[in-house]
């Protein structure tokens, strides 16, 4: 029984990596294509940067699931990135995708649209790969 417990602890330690948690591999950046005007459709563009030494798989799902908030209407609540990357020679992005979110704010004000970003990444140094889900909040400033 003791050997089983020790074995499980070793496996759990290897899966979680040093420090016990995976690093946040992608960092989103949110920009609106134009000023967000109340009552008018606008587009928020989400671009990403990856931390050095990690790559993101372009053949596995890269999705953003959003939750509507009062005062903001979303064109879509689920957005998937295209796996196309002309520079890629394998199944990893060279140029990370951008996601476009169509929104309409009912009235002027500040809003935050929550969502979950899900993607698959690999560490180039040791070959460790995993799915990661991030909580994101899209800031919206409507005039």
Task: Give, region by region, the residue ranges found by the protein language model.
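Sec-dependent N-terminal signal peptides
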Residues: 3-13
